[in-house]
Amino acid sequence: MSVTEPLILRRWSSRIRTEDCEAYVSYIRGTGVEDYLGTPGNLGCEMLLRDCGDGSTEVSTLSWWQSMESIRAFAGDDVERARYYREDDRFLLEKPDHVEHHHIVVEGLGLRRKLEQS
C-alpha cells in the first residue's frame, strides 16, 4: 500500500450499564483490543466512554486501519457488520448491526509516519 492512500477509521458505538464500566473495559482489553492489535494492517485502537447520566454509558471504539483489506482480515467479508464476542450480551444494552468507516484526510497521530518507517 502506498502511504498516500487514505487511512481508514472504523467506528463502533453502543451503550452499557455505568456500573459495568470497569468490568467491560477489562473484558474488551482481552478480546477486541487483542484482536485489533493482532491483525496486520491495524494501526491502533481506542475505547471511549461517555456517562449519559441515566445509568448508562456510551461506549465508542475507534480503530485505525491501513486498508479495507486489513479491515476484512479483522471483520470478515461483510466489513460493514459489527463484530461481537461471546460475552457481549452480558454487557451491551444494544447491539448495532453496523459500524462506520471514515477516510482520514487530516491526520496528526503519526500513523503515516509509522507506515513510512515500517
Task: For every predicted segment, state its role.
Residues 2, 11-12, 19:
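Intrinsically disordered, low-complexity segments
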Residues 8-15, 44-78:
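Short, well-ordered beta-strand segments in beta-rich or mixed alpha/beta enzyme
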Residues 20-22, 69-71, 107:
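Residue-level signal for secondary-structure boundary sites
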Residues 27-42, 64-101:
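An amphipathic, aromatic/His-enriched active-site/gating alpha helix that lines ligand/cofactor pockets
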Residues 1-7, 46-57, 83-118:
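Glycine-rich beta-strand-turn "strand-cap" elements at beta-sheet edges
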Residues 3-5, 30-31, 41-43, 59:
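Short, mixed-charge, low-aromatic patches
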Residues 15-28:
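Short, surface-exposed ligand-recognition loops at beta-strand->loop->(often short) alpha-helix junctions
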